[in-house]
Amino acid sequence: MATHLFDLTGKIALVTGASRGIGEEIAKLLAEQGAHVIVSSRKIEDCQRVANEIIAANGKAEAFACHVGKLEDIAEIFEYIRKEHGRLDILVNNAAANPYFGHILDTDIGAYNKTVEVNIRGYFFMSIEAGKLMKEQGSGAIVNTASVNALQPGDRQGIYSITKAAVVNMTKAFAKECGPLGIRMNALLPGLTKTKFASALFENEDIYKSWMDTIPLRRHAEPREMAGTVLYLVSDAASYTNGECIVVDGGLTI
């Protein structure tokens, strides 16, 4: 049974990028604590799988496909939320794009646009639409998934690192302007986590070893280890936490 501080019973939560990895674990943990979770990602069948697993575990969930890089998709999902639920208590911006892994000088315009459209523009306009609903109800919590690359740019991850640094400042800007409206925004900065999204780092032995040599815990994280921080940030336990960017990296950035 959920404890009082972390109880999300009756809350409506939207988690993007929730069909796998960190997003999937966030969606499942929020549901375990009582939230009704809207599982969102680009492919409806992947979202439905996660929603079905939540429901099978006696949780509340539904699937809704949304490509956050497309403004029309953002408008559609929030029209649905407003019509079907009339409120949104929690938004977790977790969808991300990292199409290019290589030297920064070789970044092409296609990779640049795709990364910026999802990681910056997508987060920005998802937050605006969520913020409008939350302003009406006088409360809400938004969490952005950034990255330790926002603090220490990753080798051969230039444009991705740049967008995640933007997410950190976006978090602080929204927190400052929306705090008076009862809306909190914080960010999670994961370290090296075993996901399909980060597969390029695990497949390159030299890069993986360089990470292991610099992480004091001498291991990578599992997706579930990121979800707990998000639960804290969206719960009453963090009711006075606003504009914070919490690093969960095994000590990498010490």
Regions found by a protein language model. Name each.
Residues 12, 19-20:
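Conserved glycine-rich cofactor-binding loop
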Residues 44, 65-77, 109:
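The beta1-alpha1 cofactor-binding region of Rossmann-like NAD(H)/NADP(H)-dependent oxidoreductases
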Residues 102-104, 108-113, 211:
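Substrate-binding pocket helix/loop in short-chain dehydrogenase/reductase
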Residues 124, 219-248, 253:
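C-terminal substrate-recognition "lid" of short-chain dehydrogenase/reductases
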Residues 127, 163, 171:
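Active-site helix of classical SDR
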Residues 147:
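Residue(s) in the substrate-gating loop at a strand-loop-helix junction
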Residues 179, 184, 241-243:
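Short, small/polar-rich loop/turn modules that mediate ligand/substrate recognition or access, typified
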